[in-house]
A protein has these predicted regions:
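Terminal, non-globular segments
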Residues: 1-171
Length: 171
């Protein structure tokens, strides 16, 4: 019973922890202000799509995407569409490649970068942001990728362990 509740509880905790880590941003380094955007929940959803169940990761993606839209950005539908789409794409990709932790980590970081780019382009398109692409790349995208990669290196194996444990329990 405990393992059954573990997957949604971890997702809820990650959803609640992200804004706490966002408080550490912006940071001034190398005469530049950098922004670190935690994407812990998004990475967890991608791990669910790869190691557990694509359908459940899509459902979690829609639910938490809507919650993210409502509580953090006030534009309904952006994350509610991007989270499940990313889960679908990564689950399709891993059918053709090895599902080792290193490969999934690289793919997850790639999807974090892609998510950040799509969100930036959307906000730029609706004039919600005015920073240029170069500033975005240097002050937000690259630091966000490194920060989330560090998080995955530290906790990715724990994600995989919990998800695999739940999968074995359901068999």
């Amino acid at each position: 019973m405990f393992i059954r509740l573990l997957l949604p509880v971890v997702a809820i905790l990650l959803f609640l922890i992200e804004p706490v880590f966002a408080l550490f941003s912006p940071v001034e380094m190398f005469d530049r202000i950098i922004y670190l955007v935690p994407r812990f929940l998004f990475m967890y959803l991608l791990f669910l799509a790869v190691y557990y169940d694509r359908k459940k990761s899509i459902i979690y993606g829609v639910i938490f995407g809507l919650l993210y839209d409502v509580f953090y950005i006030d534009i309904i539908g952006l994350y509610a569409v991007l989270y499940p789409l990313s889960c679908i794409f990564i689950s399709k990709i891993v059918k053709y490649i090895q599902q080792s932790l290193a490969i999934v980590t690289i793919l997850t970081v790639f999807f974090v970068a892609l998510l950040e780019l799509v969100i930036y382009e959307f906000f730029f398109l609706i004039s919600f942001t005015s920073i240029g692409m170069e500033d975005f790349l240097l002050s937000r995208l690259v630091p966000t990728i490194f920060a989330n990669l560090l998080f995955l290196i530290l906790l990715g194996w724990i994600f995989k362990y919990f998800i695999k444990t739940r999968k074995l329990q359901s068999v």
